[in-house]
């Protein structure tokens, strides 16, 4: 038999079960990523002043009597540790794959298409970018950019 083929029927079934288990695990991850709501933390008084509203970045309220800092009812939530993304899905692509930045076609050799999604580095030129994209698609990788 060839090198990659299973020796018996039991091994074939075991290999199939492993593939299905991995697929189910990735589906669970994908659902967990989708269900994780992303809070949009507002800057204090951004609902009142247009100049704060259009600047969409977080600033911690620090005033002595600031109602938002005191977490009073009717004021938006402030950034806290409890809002952090679960460790299992932190930094993952919404597809459930782990993102990897690639700067040459050689980098693809150490990666697995079942686990990784490819981002081509921003410093790569057009010709090399096309070469990396072609190599990635031949090996079955998904290219995100």
UniProtKB/Swiss-Prot annotation:
Q: Which SMART domains match?
A: Ribosomal_L32e
Keywords linked to the UniProt accession:
Ribonucleoprotein, Ribosomal protein
PROSITE patterns given in the database record: RIBOSOMAL_L32E
What is the top-level taxon of the source organism?
Answer: Archaea
Tell me which GO cellular component terms the UniProt record holds.
cytosolic large ribosomal subunit
Q: Does the keyword Cell wall biogenesis/degradation apply?
A: no
One of the entry's Gene Ontology molecular-function terms is: structural constituent of ribosome
Record InterPro entries = Ribosomal_eL32, Ribosomal_eL32_arc, Ribosomal_eL32_CS, Ribosomal_eL32_sf
* GO biological process terms held by the UniProt record: translation
The family line of this record is: Belongs to the eukaryotic ribosomal protein eL32 family.
- Record-given protein name: Large ribosomal subunit protein eL32
Origin organism is Aeropyrum pernix (strain ATCC 700893 / DSM 11879 / JCM 9820 / NBRC 100138 / K1)
Instruction: State the taxonomy lineage.
Output: Archaea, Thermoproteota, Thermoprotei, Desulfurococcales, Desulfurococcaceae
Q: Which gene encodes it?
A: rpl32e
């Amino acid at each position: 038999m060839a090198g990659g083929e299973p020796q018996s029927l039991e091994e074939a079934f075991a290999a199939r079960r492993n593939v299905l288990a991995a697929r189910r695990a990735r589906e669970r991850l994908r659902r967990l990523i989708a269900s994780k709501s992303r809070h949009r933390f507002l800057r204090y008084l951004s609902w009142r002043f247009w100049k704060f509203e259009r600047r969409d970045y977080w600033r911690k309220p620090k005033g002595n009597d600031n109602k938002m800092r005191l977490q009073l009812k009717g004021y938006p939530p402030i950034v806290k540790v409890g809002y952090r993304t679960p460790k299992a899905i932190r930094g993952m692509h919404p597809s459930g794959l782990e993102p990897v930045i690639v700067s040459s076609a050689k980098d693809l050799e150490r990666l697995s298409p079942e686990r990784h999604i490819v981002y081509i580095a921003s410093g790569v030129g057009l010709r090399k970018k096309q070469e990396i994209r072609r190599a990635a698609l031949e090996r079955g990788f998904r290219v995100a950019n």
